[in-house]
Curated annotation (Swiss-Prot):
Name of the protein in question: ATP synthase F(0) complex subunit 8
A GO-annotated cellular component: proton-transporting ATP synthase complex
Function: Subunit 8, of the mitochondrial membrane ATP synthase complex (F(1)F(0) ATP synthase or Complex V) that produces ATP from ADP in the presence of a proton gradient across the membrane which is generated by electron transport complexes of the respiratory chain. ATP synthase complex consist of a soluble F(1) head domain - the catalytic core - and a membrane F(1) domain - the membrane proton channel. These two domains are linked by a central stalk rotating inside the F(1) region and a stationary peripheral stalk.
Transmembrane stretches, start-end: 13-35
Species for this entry: Myxine glutinosa
GO BP annotations listed: proton motive force-driven ATP synthesis
Family: Belongs to the ATPase protein 8 family.
UniProt subcellular location: Mitochondrion membrane
Bilayer topology: Single-pass membrane protein
InterPro entries, per the entry: ATP8_metazoa
The organism's place on the tree of life at top rank: Eukaryota
Amino acid sequence: MPQLNPSPWLLMALSLWVCFPLMMLSLSSFLPLTLKTSLPSTLKSSPNPWILPW
């Protein structure tokens, strides 16, 4: 039974293709919570386009 040996580039691309949406999903769900709790009120009230009003 010959063992399949995929190229490391293909393996890395596949793992990135699988993990990247999951990481973005977890970031988009966890980042606003941490921003809301950890940022001081001065930074919260400043108009920052990267902080989305969740």
